[in-house]
Each structure stands twice: as structure tokens, then as C-alpha cells.
């Protein structure tokens, strides 16, 4: 299977494989991920890890993976216009010899990926509404939910919240533009079966879709 993972950056601009904007849930640390320097982050211990290890640097992760399986990287965003993580990620994958694509919730990030890494497939992550993002204005939330940024982002695929399927936006992209639709995050075979007619790929955890669906 391909690997899907998220990237965050340290205060000094290093990219790490890490999901959350804060440290508490996944490490023994506290506070914003972005507030720590790379050396501090590397010294943290991940919760529930088989070995005593910290969040991996993206550079180390890419070297370890070495193109053995496809990689889907989600570039996390705080929707504050900071381009550091996107630029660092694109620089690190510039010479990566393996199948890789990039995606983000933030249209500005996807548009920048289009400029910095046009040869790499890029996707927009979205859902039916963004009411849980109060930092965004109503116009921004509407544009993201209805994919009104296409002229700037020009995504190659859509990654949609599976709870919102079926939905007109990904359906039209798939049926009229032959654009692949990925759904996130599927945690059991029953959910995978329900959305199967509407998607081409899934982000999954906790079960084997090759044998359980």
C-alpha cells in the first residue's frame, strides 16, 4: 500500500512527519509544534511508538522510504500565509526518486506547489463545510467547500471527507473532468463499502481494505 502522512515545520523551518499542530496528543511535549526548534522536536518521544523515537525529519523519512511505495504528503497549514513549510517540502522532494504527490486543505499551499513542483501530482483536501475553521472568513470557507479556487490551484485530484459523500463537488469533478477522488479517513470495511461508488482511492487505518472489504 501507499503511505499517507502529514508534515509540519519547526520554528527554524525544518519539515517533520507529524499530524497535529500541537504536541500533547502524540508526544510527551506541550504547546504548538511550530514553537519548537528542530533539535528540540527530534528529542521528543512519540507516544505509543514501538521504539523510543521522536518525530522523524521529512528528509530522513524520504531516505528511509527510498521510493519503495507511493507516498502521499499532506502539507499542514495554519492559513496564515506562511510559505516556509511548502517551500521546504518541495525542496526536499525535488530529487526524490519515487512516486509522490502533495495535497493540502489550503488552496494557497496547493497553488504554491503548482509553481514550485509542477511535475508532482497535487490535490486539494476538502469537505462539505468549514464551520470548524473560525480563523477563515465566510468567503474563504465557501470557496474551499465549493472548490472555487480551481483556476489558481489546478489540482490533479480531490481528497474529500468520507462523511460528506456523496457530494456534488467531488462528483462533478470525477464525472465531468475525470478527476480522481480520494476519501479520508476510512476506519472500517463497512465505511469503505458505502463510499466505494463515489471514490477511486481511500486513506485508511485500522483495517486491511485488500482483505476486509
PLM regions: where:
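Glycine-rich, proline-tolerant flexible connector loops at the mouths of alpha/beta enzymes
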Residues: 9-22
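Catalytic domains of carbohydrate-active enzymes, especially glycoside hydrolases
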Residues: 1-9, 152-157
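C-terminal active-site rim and adjoining tail of enzyme catalytic domains
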Residues: 132-213
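Phosphate- and divalent-cation-binding pockets in alpha/beta enzyme and binding domains
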Residues: 12, 112-113, 168, 194
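Generic enzyme active-site microenvironment
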Residues: 4, 18, 72, 203
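Paired acidic/hydrophobic, glycine-rich loop segments that form the ligand-binding mouth/hinge
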Residues: 3, 121-123, 201-203
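Metal-dependent phosphodiesterase/phospholipase catalytic core, i.e.
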Residues: 19-129, 151-155, 160-163
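Short alpha-helical
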Residues: 10-11, 80, 108, 165, ...
Amino acid at each position: 500500500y501507499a503511505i499517507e502522512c502529514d508534515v509540519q515545520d519547526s520554528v527554524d523551518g525544518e519539515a517533520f512527519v507529524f499530524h497535529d499542530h500541537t504536541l500533547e496528543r502524540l508526544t510527551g511535549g506541550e504547546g504548538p509544534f511550530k514553537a519548537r526548534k528542530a533539535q528540540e522536536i527530534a528529542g521528543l518521544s512519540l507516544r505509543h511508538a514501538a521504539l523510543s523515537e521522536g518525530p522523524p525529519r521529512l528528509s530522513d523519512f524520504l531516505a528511509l522510504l527510498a521510493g519503495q511505495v507511493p507516498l502521499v504528503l499532506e502539507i499542514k497549514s495554519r492559513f496564515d500565509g506562511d510559505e516556509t513549510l511548502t517551500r521546504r517540502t518541495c525542496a526536499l522532494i525535488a530529487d526524490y526518486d519515487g512516486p509522490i504527490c502533495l495535497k493540502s486543505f489550503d488552496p494557497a499551499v496547493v497553488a504554491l506547489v503548482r509553481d514550485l513542483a509542477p511535475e508532482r501530482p497535487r490535490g486539494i483536501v476538502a469537505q462539505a463545510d468549514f464551520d470548524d475553521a473560525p480563523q477563515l472568513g465566510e468567503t474563504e470557507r465557501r470557496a474551499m467547500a465549493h472548490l472555487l479556487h480551481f483556476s489558481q490551484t489546478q489540482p490533479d485530484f480531490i481528497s474529500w471527507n468520507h462523511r460528506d459523500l456523496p457530494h456534488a463537488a467531488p462528483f462533478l469533478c470525477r464525472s465531468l473532468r475525470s478527476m480522481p477522488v480520494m476519501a479520508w479517513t476510512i476506519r472500517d470495511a463497512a465505511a469503505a463499502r458505502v463510499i466505494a461508488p463515489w471514490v477511486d482511492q481511500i486513506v485508511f487505518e485500522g483495517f486491511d481494505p485488500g482483505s476486509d472489504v
